[in-house]
């Protein structure tokens, strides 16, 4: 289609438009609008598409549709369909006219993202800043992507945060507490555990204006001294001396900061000249770690005219040492994130070392403070200089940016008068500050980082009365800065990126979970976060956190993973189109894992890749095996070509392994963790089967009709759900279940209103690391052990009969829906038919099996999502010899052994019955009872005397517990319990 007249000229030709519009009847316009409506309704949920005006310029007919038309995701096929359909509706006098359909100041074919065009527009400028070296490079990584996001810098933030409200003189959330979360924390549950790692695994440097570490401890080690603790800063001089830098640096002079105080303007920094060979000069920052845990490591330095682009930092941690090269030609005077690592409590368990060795001699390396951990808020606000008393990761961007040394012109446009406005405004201004001085933003001063794109992750408000989905909205802005980026590229590139990301999100949700997921508009509107950044930017409103139908999906970690992967894919597509490269999507995590003994001191680990039905490029090419010995942490990994790995192990220690798949696009998320241990003078070998795969949203309900219009909600006390590793967005139980109660204020949010007693807490979930917990107790009892995933037993590679004892981990496994349910099959059944068959065969051959899980009975007898199967109950009663009595059997987390024919089974035990950061919660354990005369109750819940454990001895032995072994509170209790179980399984003499 020819485009002979630009939109600007058309706007000026208003009178010809009006007169010529009379040549196209209202009836034809209506039919064209209906056609466009039909195209739109295939994809989006918006208002009607209308033809607002018509113009005839020579032999060109131009139709101008309203903005609803611009919300259609235009592709070559539907654009051709539209033009063909509209042409057929035109009167005969227009048969030989060239036809153009305009919306959003563009012909519709120009709104097809460049990434999705079969023929590229070679004249269109792209946004592709060049970079010789990225900000941070992990040089210890065994594999680097070539067709991913390598060398790219992405500015990304999750919405809102805890802030100081001047009008009320209090700290508060920027949104309402609703459906067990608050937007200020909710979007973090996508960004931090899922989206950021995906982008980093693809090679990107991700820059954030909020604290990314949820650890509330923070250690500052600085050349200007430490405010507290015994951390040390040490310089070691080689061939080149350390000198005082000219200018200011960081100093930690106070516990809290008022007004516009800037810690990066209150201290000094150190400099040294680089060498290529000879004796290195080094700085060592040695922190005093308050407690065992994982901590983010940040470094700081100053950027000088002659700065090196390869400053070598080494982080010493529980898993070994990891090296990074930092390009100090950018990013000076703020906190630069290296990675997150495990450290032991105390001083000497870890350190950060900076060397002056470089590829080029005569450059300058600078050294300033190191920050370890996330910490608590330390920015004081209001007349009483009140700090938030919340973890820093809860706070809004405005406060992090002050702590990170960003100029006050960025984080407080209001000069300290309006923190709410400052918080949403500072994010976009911060993007420009990051890019200031680079080719991306050469007109402003800043950190010289060539930012490729910016992304604001929000959720929206709004409700529906019929449990339909509000859905996904994308926002961008094209008019700012005369509609162009600094290199002359059109700001309509933000439309391209918005379309790609929104399309990936909606298409993937529809394909995997909810065919009726709503795609809302793509708004070209002047939202501050979309307008201000001088880089391609999208503001995402993923769903409505106020709408129950949306949040039935939105609280599920599986949904969060899928959405985050879709966002990553959209960014990848967009950036590949800007650089003219082919992209490859990182693989999905591997499965079908097993580790077994081979020879006297070796083990073999095996696994299988997982195909991605939604992405043909996401194929595994190689793998990385990560190793953890004893109570250490995982190493930097070993690159493997095939699907197996053999290695020697030390005797008497638990050795653990996780695997990632890699390809040219990057690295997958990690697999579950399997463990193995060879005991000194081993009494035998135990197979640990990890059957706890579940991650899910909490239980929910809709009251039976006619009450379905009156009551609904989430039921934590029945089933809190299972977070992926940990949950950083949960605030407390829902307390308002009446649908009719409206939002009145953020302090009275109506239907869905929730408590806030957990909003500063990190809640433990499924770590996929339980074979090591079981294995440590097995090893202590004098037995060796190996482990495998449940699917290897179900599909056959691992034979239970090869092991005298089997320990099946079921955790909180139970049949679980996604969202409203009924669209996809239930997942996470405790005992699938193949598993039942494998166990029945094993028991028939005289095996010994230990099974523990919170829903071992409920899932087969009383799962409200599934119809009980007689075959399932028969398996439990006739093979494992137990039957279900009741769910939600206890609340106090205490069990005791009771008199039985089995004297080895003794002791009292406690398990995690409340939400905490160490173990997933067991809020609703099962009471189970003997199903045959040779089976006995051997444990009871202390508060009710309901049966908690059943043991059977006959031709084989079973020990079944209605609560999970790995949730037992202390190592000593677990060792005693496992020893009792294994003694029970000993053959009688």
Give the location of each predicted region.
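Beta-strand-rich modules
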Residues: 646-667
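Helical hinge/lid and interdomain linker segments adjacent to catalytic or ligand-binding clefts
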Residues: 726-867
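Short beta-strand-plus-loop segments that form exposed binding edges in beta-rich domains
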Residues: 352-364
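A short beta-strand element within beta-rich, extracytoplasmic domains
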Residues: 281-305
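Pro/Thr/Ser/Gly-rich low-complexity, intrinsically disordered linker/stalk tracts
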Residues: 574-617, 665-684
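Active-site microenvironments of hydrolase-like enzyme catalytic domains
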Residues: 394-491, 495, 523-546
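Active-site-adjacent mobile loop/cap segments within catalytic or ligand-binding domains
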Residues: 357, 369-377, 453-481, 513-581, ...
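A glycine-rich, often tryptophan-bearing local segment used as a flexible ligand/cofactor-contacting loop or short
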Residues: 812-920, 934-935, 942, 973, ...
């Amino acid at each position: 289609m020819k485009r002979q007249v630009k939109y600007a000229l058309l706007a000026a030709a208003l009178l010809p438009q009006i007169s010529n519009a009379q040549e196209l009847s209202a009836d034809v316009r209506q039919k064209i609008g209906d056609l466009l409506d039909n195209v739109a309704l295939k994809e989006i949920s918006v208002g009607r598409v209308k033809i607002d005006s018509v113009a005839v310029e020579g032999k060109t007919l131009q139709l101008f549709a309203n903005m609803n038309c611009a919300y259609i995701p235009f592709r070559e096929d539907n654009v051709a369909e539209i033009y063909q359909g509209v042409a057929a509706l035109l009167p005969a006098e227009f048969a030989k006219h060239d036809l153009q359909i305009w919306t959003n100041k563009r012909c519709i074919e120009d709104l097809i993202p460049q990434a999705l065009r079969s023929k590229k527009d070679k004249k269109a400028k792209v946004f592709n800043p060049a970079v010789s070296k990225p900000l941070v490079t992990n040089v210890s990584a065994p594999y680097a992507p070539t067709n991913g996001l390598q060398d790219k810098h992405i500015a990304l933030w999750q919405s809102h945060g805890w802030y100081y409200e001047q009008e009320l003189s209090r700290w508060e959330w920027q949104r309402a507490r609703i459906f067990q979360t608050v937007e200020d924390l909710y979007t973090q549950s996508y960004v931090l555990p899922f989206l950021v790692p995906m982008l980093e695994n693809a090679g990107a440097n991700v820059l954030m204006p909020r604290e990314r570490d949820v650890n509330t401890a923070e250690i500052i080690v600085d050349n200007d001294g430490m405010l507290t603790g015994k951390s040390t800063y040490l310089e070691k001089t080689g061939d080149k001396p350390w000198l005082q830098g000219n200018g200011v640096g960081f100093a930690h002079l106070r516990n809290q900061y008022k007004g516009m105080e800037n810690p990066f303007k209150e201290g000094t920094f150190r400099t040294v000249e680089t060498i290529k060979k000879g004796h290195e000069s080094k700085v060592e920052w040695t922190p005093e770690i308050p407690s065992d845990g994982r901590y983010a490591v940040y470094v700081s330095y100053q950027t000088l005219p002659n700065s090196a682009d390869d400053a070598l930092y080494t982080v010493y941690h529980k898993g070994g040492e990891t090296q990074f090269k930092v390009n100090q030609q950018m990013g000076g005077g703020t906190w630069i994130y290296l990675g997150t690592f495990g450290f032991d409590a105390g001083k000497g368990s870890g350190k950060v070392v900076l060397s002056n060795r470089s590829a080029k001699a005569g450059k300058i390396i600078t050294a300033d403070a190191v920050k370890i951990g996330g910490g608590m808020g330390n920015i004081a606000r209001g007349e009483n200089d009140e700090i938030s008393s919340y973890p820093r990761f809860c706070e809004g961007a405005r406060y992090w940016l002050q702590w990170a040394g960003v100029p006050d012109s960025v984080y407080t446009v209001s000069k300290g008068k309006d923190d709410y406005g400052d918080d949403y405004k500072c994010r976009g201004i911060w993007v420009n500050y990051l890019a200031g001085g680079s080719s991306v933003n050469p007109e402003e001063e800043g950190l010289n980082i060539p930012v490729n794109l910016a992304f604001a992750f929000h959720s929206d408000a709004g409700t529906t009365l019929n449990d339909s989905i509000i859905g996904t909205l994308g926002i961008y802005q094209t008019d700012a800065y005369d509609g162009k980026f600094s290199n002359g590229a059109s700001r309509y590139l933000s439309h391209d990126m918005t379309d790609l990301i929104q399309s990936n999100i909606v298409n993937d949700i529809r394909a995997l979970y909810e065919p009726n997921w709503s795609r809302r508009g793509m708004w070209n509107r002047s939202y501050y976060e979309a307008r201000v950044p001088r880089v391609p930017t999208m503001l995402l409103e993923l769903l409505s956190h106020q709408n129950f139908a949306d949040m039935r999906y939105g609280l599920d970690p599986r949904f969060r993973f899928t959405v985050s992967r879709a966002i990553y894919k959209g960014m990848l597509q967009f950036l590949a189109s800007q650089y003219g490269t082919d992209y490859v999507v990182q693989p999905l995590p591997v499965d079908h894992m097993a580790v077994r003994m081979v020879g006297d001191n070796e083990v073999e680990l095996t696994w299988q890749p997982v195909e991605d039905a939604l992405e043909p490029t996401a194929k595994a090419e190689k793998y990385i095996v990560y190793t953890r010995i004893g109570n250490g942490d995982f190493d930097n990994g070993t690159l493997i070509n095939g699907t197996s790995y053999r290695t020697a192990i030390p005797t008497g220690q638990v050795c653990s392994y996780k695997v990632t798949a890699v390809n040219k696009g990057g690295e997958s998320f990690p697999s579950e963790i399997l463990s193995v241990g060879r005991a000194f003078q081993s009494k035998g070998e135990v197979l640990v089967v990890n059957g706890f795969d579940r991650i899910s949203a909490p239980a929910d309900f809709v009251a039976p009709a006619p009450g379905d219009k009156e009551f609904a909600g989430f039921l934590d006390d029945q089933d809190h759900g299972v977070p992926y590793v940990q949950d950083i967005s949960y605030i407390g139980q829902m307390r308002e279940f009446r649908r009719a109660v409206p939002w009145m204020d953020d302090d009275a949010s109506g239907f869905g209103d929730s408590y806030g007693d957990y909003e500063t807490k990190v809640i433990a979930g499924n770590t996929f690391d339980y074979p090591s917990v079981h294995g440590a107790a097995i090893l202590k009892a004098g037995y060796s052990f190996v482990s495998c995933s449940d699917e290897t037993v179900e599909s056959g590679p691992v034979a239970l009969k090869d092991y005298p004892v089997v320990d099946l981990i079921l955790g909180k496994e139970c049949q679980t829906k996604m969202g409203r349910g009924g669209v996809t099959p239930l997942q996470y059944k405790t005992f699938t038919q193949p598993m039942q068959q494998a166990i029945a065969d094993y028991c028939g051959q005289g095996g010994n099996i230990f099974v523990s899980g919170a829903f071992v009975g409920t899932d087969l007898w009383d799962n409200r999502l599934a119809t009980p199967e007689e075959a399932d109950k028969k398996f439990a009663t006739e093979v494992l010899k137990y039957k279900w009595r009741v769910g939600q059997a206890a609340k106090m987390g205490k069990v005791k052994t009771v008199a039985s024919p089995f004297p080895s089974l003794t002791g009292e035990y406690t398990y995690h019955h409340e939400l905490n950061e160490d173990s997933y919660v067991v809020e609703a354990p099962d009471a189970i009872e003997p199903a045959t005369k040779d089976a006995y109750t051997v444990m009871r819940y202390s508060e009710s005397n309901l049966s908690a454990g059943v043991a059977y001895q006959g031709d084989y032995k079973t020990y079944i517990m209605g609560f999970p072994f790995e949730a037992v509170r202390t190592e000593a209790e677990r060792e005693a319990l496992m020893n009792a179980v294994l003694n029970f399984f000993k053959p009688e003499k």
